[in-house]
Amino acid sequence: MKPKFETVELLSPTGEVVELKVVKRGLAQARPEPVDRNKPAWIKAPLPTGPRYQALKAMVRELRLHTVCQEALCPNIGECWTHGTLTVMILGDICTRACKFCAVHTGNPKGLVDPEEPRRVAEAIARMGVRYVVLTSVDRDDLPDGGASHFAATIRAIKERAPGVLVEALTPDFQGDLKAVETVLAANPEVYAQNLETVRRLTPKVRDPRAGYEQTLKVLAHAKKVRPDILTKSSLMLGLGETEEEILEAMRDLRAAGVDILTLGQYLRPTPAHLPVARYVPPEDFKRYEAWGYELGFREVFAGPLVRSSYRADRVFLEATQR
């Protein structure tokens, strides 16, 4: 079965309406599987509600921002937004890649970039009054630098408009372009993050072919080599069919790359068309993996069923800086 493309209209910086073909919620699988309604109690999150959540939702819409909280259907959106924190996604909401776990739209943005986005994002952060922001983006393989210069411009705009705000840059792999990595680092984020996502064996099955296990490790190692003063961070999803030996191998590889902070969480299928969950990892197993991480020398490890790379990122950063 071929992917179902939809046509969307975007306004270019020159005011021209551009039509793009996208696959909503990613390519995923051709044959959707039944929804799993027997999820264990430990991974159920409360529905988003409350005045703070509604206020943030309205502000995001008003300022025309994209958040990974919404685009990736994150189960923690209610908790995070109620506490006034969110992960801002820049460079649009159309990704040039099609990872099998991700619900972000897939297509070709044709080089479109909103030059006003850094200013709008900085204004939103200032108005929200947050002290810590996670900045991430879709993959933009259609851009010469993968969007690194836009990423850096947004970090600088935030720091200029809202002095004192701490910024975590959760970047794409820029196709292994180390100059692009250096461009982002030059904007002085407090944390540089790139997610390994899964173990070596499952990477071809889970991630887009343009991503790579070794490529992510290379990016993280280079970031630490160039800017040892900046904390590096990565994340693993569990429950995709990996073994404990493979989890430990991935953790060791991340430590060898100089990664300071590690998060581990349960993979949850965003739609029936995405990769099925192979196993629901119980909380006690996450506790063991967390202990492994500290034994390996990570400065901070945050592991649990609902943990995501940007979940409680401000607290994780604080813990890492105090060790």
Swiss-Prot record:
Limits of the Radical SAM core domain: 81-299
Q: How is the cofactor bound?
A: Binds 2 [4Fe-4S] clusters per subunit. One cluster is coordinated with 3 cysteines and an exchangeable S-adenosyl-L-methionine.
Major enzyme class: transferase
What SUPFAM superfamilies does its record include?
Radical SAM enzymes
Question: Which metal ions or organic cofactors does this protein require, according to UniProt?
Answer: [4Fe-4S] cluster
> A single Pfam family, by name?
LIAS_N
Describe which pathway this protein belongs to, using the record's wording. Answer: Protein modification; protein lipoylation via endogenous pathway; protein N(6)-(lipoyl)lysine from octanoyl-[acyl-carrier-protein]: step 2/2
Annotated positions binding [4Fe-4S] cluster 1: C69, C74, C80, S310
UniProt keywords, alphabetically: 4Fe-4S, Cytoplasm, Iron, Iron-sulfur, Metal-binding, S-adenosyl-L-methionine, Transferase
The record's section on InterPro entries has:
Aldolase_TIM, Elp3/MiaA/NifB-like_rSAM, LIAS_N, Lipoyl_synth, rSAM
Listed EC numbers: 2.8.1.8
Sites binding [4Fe-4S] cluster 2 sit at C95, C99, C102
The record's GO molecular-function terms, alphabetically, read: 4 iron, 4 sulfur cluster binding; lipoate synthase activity; metal ion binding
Q: Which NCBIfam families match?
A: lipA, PRK05481.1, PRK12928.1
Q: Which family does it belong to?
A: Belongs to the radical SAM superfamily. Lipoyl synthase family.
The name this protein carries in UniProt is: Lipoyl synthase
Origin organism of this chain?
Answer: Thermus thermophilus (strain ATCC 27634 / DSM 579 / HB8)
